[in-house]
Amino acid sequence: MAQLKITQVKSYIGSKQNHRDTLRSLGLKGINTQVVKEDRPEFRGMVHTVRHLVTVEEVD
């Protein structure tokens, strides 16, 4: 199954609380932190919520 490499590229300071909660749920704790998650609709939805703060790459 494909995986997503999610990298936080911008700070969450000044963003809404639900965006902060989403970053925490993804496991991102600061700028330039990376996590690898399964490519599932739940994670795609989370990434869509914070798309202005993260970058996403597909990894096999």
UniProtKB/Swiss-Prot annotation:
Cellular component GO terms held in the UniProt record: cytosolic large ribosomal subunit
Keyword line: Ribonucleoprotein, Ribosomal protein
One term of GO molecular function: structural constituent of ribosome
The protein's assembly and partners: Part of the 50S ribosomal subunit.
Protein name, per record: Large ribosomal subunit protein uL30
Any one GO biological process: translation
Superkingdom to which the source organism belongs: Bacteria
Gene3D superfamilies: Ribosomal protein L30, ferredoxin-like fold domain
UniProt cross-references to NCBIfam families, sorted A to Z: rpmD_bact
Residues annotated as transmembrane: none
Family, per entry: Belongs to the universal ribosomal protein uL30 family.
